[in-house]
Amino acid sequence: MIVDFYFDFLSPFSYLANQRLSKLAQDYGLTIRYNAIDLARVKIAIGNVGPSNRDLKVKLDYLKVDLQRWAQLYGIPLVFPANYNSRRMNIGFYYSGAEAQAAAYVNVVFNAVWGEGIAPDLESLPALVSEKLGWDRSAFEHFLSSNAATERYDEQTHAAIERKVFGVPTMFLGDEMWWGNDRLFMLESAMGRLCRQNADLSS
């Protein structure tokens, strides 16, 4: 069973969804296909050019409370970073190759940015990530500034737009789409139905 997961490291709701998806992967033997995308470009593509949540103080004040509720429910810390300049670490995702490496990178960066409140554009963050993942630091930093990395990021963002992704986190099971951390219980229900159908077919 494969779930496509679209995220941007600037999104606290993507951080929450990643935690829950990791648990679902263990429970259901789920394969997660990770896709780091440019949320700003995705929103512009559908005409969503209004102010972001962080520019709406009343809404942001509520969201901070709501996010802490979710974090407590999941048993994880949630600390707002100093900024949301996630482009570099989004691009860095495409340095990871195998599925296990991709999952490890996503977990390390999300935990740094939203678990510890480290700014995603902190100059030393790539070195920290490289050390935790056992990567060659200079090779990773070279990749971050390469045209090939930027092109891959742009291609994946365009592919998300073509698939009608309009926000993050977004998850697909087959052709069925769910948007939002609060839709994961619906995704899990669909996964359960699929498991039962497969069991019936094999019996």
Curated annotation (Swiss-Prot):
Q: Name one GO biological process term.
A: naphthalene catabolic process
Q: In which pathway does it act?
A: Aromatic compound metabolism; naphthalene degradation
Q: Which family does it belong to?
A: Belongs to the GST superfamily. NadH family.
State which gene encodes it: nahD
Superkingdom per UniProt: Bacteria
Query: What is the E.C. number?
Result: 5.99.1.4
Q: Where is the active site?
A: S11 (nucleophile)
Report keywords, A-Z. Answer: Aromatic hydrocarbons catabolism, Isomerase, Plasmid
Q: Which SUPFAM superfamilies match?
A: Thioredoxin-like
Binding locations of substrate: K43, N53, R54, Y84
Cofactor dependency: glutathione
Q: What is this protein called?
A: 2-hydroxychromene-2-carboxylate isomerase
